[in-house]
Structures are given as C-alpha cells and as structure tokens.
C-alpha cells in the first residue's frame, strides 16, 4: 500500500506531487493551496504529500516507510494538522501553529503544517498567518486546504494583480 493509495481519481495530481517530493528539496515551494469541494479528498492529498516529503523514499515505495505511516496516522512529531469543527479557526489557534512552525523538525527534513478548511479564518486571523506563509522558516512547508481557489482567504494570500487561477498555475509550474 503506497502513501498515495487513498487518493482516488487524481492520478495527474499524484504524479506531479510524486515528482515534486522526490525532486530537489531546495526547489520545493514552501506554501501550498490544495483546493477541492467538501469530500473531494483535499485533506488526504495534503497528508499523502506530507508523508512523501517526510519519507526517506519520497513516497515512491510500494509500502509506506515508518515516517510515512506516522504522518498518515497523525502521529509524526514534525507534522501538525490544524482542523476545527467550529465555524471559524481562531486567532489563538493560528498563533500556536505559527509558534510550532518556527521549531526545527526533530526527526524529518521538514516541519509540515496542514491547515484544513483555511477558508474558515476571519480576515484578522488570515493576516496573522500571512507573514508566515509569505516568508516561511527555511524548514517549514505549509499545506493549506480550502474548498475553492476563490475562498475568502485567497485575496489576502495572493499578490495584487494576479488572478487566483494564474497564481495556482504559476505555483504548479515551479
């Protein structure tokens, strides 16, 4: 069972992420926006990508490594997931996750932060996160999950003058 087995119907995305995870670590973008409607598996994609990034075999093996198994099980010490059942993600939760993001990874090459439903942040909360996304620590990768590129969080993340679809294409081409 590969780290990618839970991703159904997204073979092109899986192939791109495999290539990125196994490529030059210096060329990996440190902030990602993973979009898809509720139930589409965007959180599964984020976890699989995190598992591949933290795994010595980069997620290319037929069986997940111990590190990949830990990421997929939610027990890896260098991968933190912020998920909420509340209506909004609070500013204190984001401040705590920023503090975590600044710590050096303990066992793996990256400190990976996954934020599910990033569109649940209010504008002031998004502004707190913005600096970290724009200038992440050299050892941190942010995986942000949202139901669409045009969610209310994106205008704060994208640079002025660049459409959401163009920014996503630009990110994928790197």
Give the residues covered by each predicted segment.
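Clamp-loader machinery-focused feature within the broader ASCE/P-loop NTPase space
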Residues: 1-124
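Short, solvent-exposed coil/turn elements at secondary-structure transition points
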Residues: 13, 85, 148, 164-166
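Short glycine-/polar-rich loops that comprise or flank the Walker A/P-loop
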Residues: 28-29, 75-78, 108-110, 136-140, ...
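Short alpha-helical
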Residues: 40, 150-151
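Glycine-rich, phosphate-binding/catalytic loops in enzymes
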Residues: 51, 130-132, 158-161
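Conserved catalytic/switch belt of AAA+ P-loop NTPases
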Residues: 102-103, 127-144
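A short beta-strand-to-loop transition that corresponds to the Sensor-1 phosphate-sensing loop
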Residues: 116-117, 144-149, 167
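Conserved AAA+ ATPase core "coupling" helix
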Residues: 152-174
């Amino acid at each position: 069972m590969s780290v990618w087995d839970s991703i159904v119907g997204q073979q092109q995305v899986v192939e791109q992420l495999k290539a990125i995870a196994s490529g030059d670590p210096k060329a990996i973008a440190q902030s990602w926006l993973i979009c898809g409607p509720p139930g589409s598996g965007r959180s599964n994609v984020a976890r699989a990508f995190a598992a591949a990034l933290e795994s010595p075999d980069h997620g290319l093996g037929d069986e997940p490594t111990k590190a990949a198994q830990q990421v997929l099980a939610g027990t890896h010490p260098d991968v933190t997931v912020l998920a909420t059942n509340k209506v909004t993600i609070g500013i204190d939760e984001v401040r705590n996750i920023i503090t975590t993001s600044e710590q050096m990874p303990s066992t793996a090459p990256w400190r990976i932060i996954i934020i599910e439903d990033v569109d649940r942040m209010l504008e002031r909360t998004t502004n707190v996160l913005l600096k970290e996304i724009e200038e992440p620590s050299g050892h941190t990768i942010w995986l942000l999950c949202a139901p669409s590129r045009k969610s209310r969080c994106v205008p704060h993340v994208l640079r002025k003058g660049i459409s959401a679809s163009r920014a996503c294409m630009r990110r994928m081409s790197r």
